[in-house]
Amino acid sequence: MSITSLKNQKEFELINKLGKKFHERYFILVIARNLPTIFLKSQYNTFLGIKVSRKLNKKAVIRNKIKRRIRHLVRIIVSDAKLSAVKFAMIIIPRKGFEEINFSHLNYELSKIVLRNI
């Protein structure tokens, strides 16, 4: 089971249009299940897009750390047996305070939303 990233603006816009948005305190999550044919032909089941703006933190090192944390969270959640067979795409947009909150709380919040809506 592997995860591939959304590559270009067109893919991000498509998922934003087709997906359902969830606003949490530390992040915004967009999940799309009914994927168009460009995604269905792919060998991957999970597509991930991460948007970390400069407003969140000016330092690139911190923004990259946030992206690594998000990728790791998604790997943990998607490794669940229920999600390994489902094709879906998601975009995660972290908010202020994301880098300070502990990992287990983020894991709980994200998995709660993903498992409920997949």
UniProtKB/Swiss-Prot annotation:
GO annotation terms (biological process): tRNA 5'-leader removal
UniProt GO MF annotations: 3'-tRNA processing endoribonuclease activity; ribonuclease P activity; tRNA binding
Name of a matching Pfam family: Ribonuclease_P
Matching Gene3D superfamilies: 3.30.230.10
PROSITE patterns linked: RIBONUCLEASE_P
EC number: 3.1.26.5
Sorted UniProt keywords: Endonuclease, Hydrolase, Nuclease, RNA-binding, tRNA processing
UniProt cross-references to InterPro entries, sorted A to Z: Ribosomal_Su5_D2-typ_SF, Ribsml_uS5_D2-typ_fold_subgr, RNase_P, RNase_P_CS
Catalytic reaction list: Endonucleolytic cleavage of RNA, removing 5'-extranucleotides from tRNA precursor
Origin superkingdom: Bacteria
GO cellular component: ribonuclease P complex
HAMAP family, sorted: RNase_P (MF_00227)
Function summary: RNaseP catalyzes the removal of the 5'-leader sequence from pre-tRNA to produce the mature 5'-terminus. It can also cleave other RNA substrates such as 4.5S RNA. The protein component plays an auxiliary but essential role in vivo by binding to the 5'-leader sequence and broadening the substrate specificity of the ribozyme.
Subunit structure: Consists of a catalytic RNA component (M1 or rnpB) and a protein subunit.
Family membership: Belongs to the RnpA family.
Stated name of the protein: Ribonuclease P protein component
Native organism taxonomy: Bacteria, Pseudomonadati, Pseudomonadota, Alphaproteobacteria, Rickettsiales
